[in-house]
């Protein structure tokens, strides 16, 4: 079983071990839910207009938002009550392991790419932007940055 997280533990999964302080009330699941809600709000506001000019696809946007941090369940662990990098997480960050999970479960390449490219850690150049990735990436970055500014790891 990859990651070793159970249903109870998933709710305690960290937002980002070593980057955001352990006392940050925003968990990884909270963050993913927030990114999904923000993507839905942005789509509701911009969807019709953005769809006319860029063919923004709602299902791709939301699927990418739901799964963008799926690899964190392989990257992180809880030891002695504190968030830390797992053995696998020492070698692969969450975008790599998340893309692996998505690809090995038959998800479309566009979703795999959204997982792989959503973080500036992996690809700051934005070599291939399409509207769903651009929107999700910017909203993810905004949500993460607010938590990080409020609870920086010292």
Set out the residue ranges of the language-model regions.
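Alpha-helix boundary/interfacial micro-motifs
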Residues: 80-81, 85-86, 123, 151
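Divalent-cation-assisted or electrostatically stabilized phosphate/pyrophosphate-binding catalytic cores
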Residues: 82-104, 129
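Histidine-centered active-site/metal-ligand motif
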Residues: 31, 68, 94, 99, ...
